[in-house]
């Protein structure tokens, strides 16, 4: 089965990001990538399988497995 459209991608939350201060649920990252948020890197801390209630902060790196094109598009928007 062809799964070329699936990608492990990272999304950096910066000072200008419209999702900073929102929870993972509120950010709609899951819906916008047709994927799963599998981890968040916050400084030296790595949080695997974060809760949807986790608040996204500046400099967080969000790791997502999902639709390749949608992850790339979201990176431009965020």
Question: Where are the regions a protein language model picked out?
Answer:
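Long, charged amphipathic helices and adjacent flexible linkers at domain junctions
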Residues: 1-11
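Cytosolic Rossmann-like ligand/nucleotide-binding regulatory domains
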Residues: 10, 14-78
